[in-house]
């Protein structure tokens, strides 16, 4: 959007955070409402994903390492944009890792004058390209693989394990979580998430939450 906001960014609902559910368990995760409907793309399109990390806890901390797991038909774009954010590509080109946020403190939760819990966050973008032979739905999964407390000491997240995401097979990726409906579709834990694009079935020129497709904001 012209004001710098993203139409696919989550609307955060913290009304149940840190309350007790019907089973007597503490609710440790906010609700993040945002569409997971695949964005239409064409072959060779450039896609920018924004990876945003929220702090839902009572301690300041750092998302020291983040990994993005690239699916078939989506490739990393070498160049100044991704270099700025410290992305490093694995030998097979399927996993990209950054420590860009390791010095960016994500502050603990606060409460406003009305008692509403407010979450702080930090974010890092990654630029990818839809391959020339792409087809169908393309699912991109990212997760936090290392977190540290305000003193830079390794810390255990209260409701998720680092580097614990189970990646679907390439055959299963296109339909990943398609059976889950609604505005809030959580990841496997609260430190991973996904987004999808779908290649248009009609091709003229045919040239992962998503903020920009080939220099045009997603609406």
Residue spans for each PLM region:
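Exported/extracytosolic protein signature
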Residues: 1-219
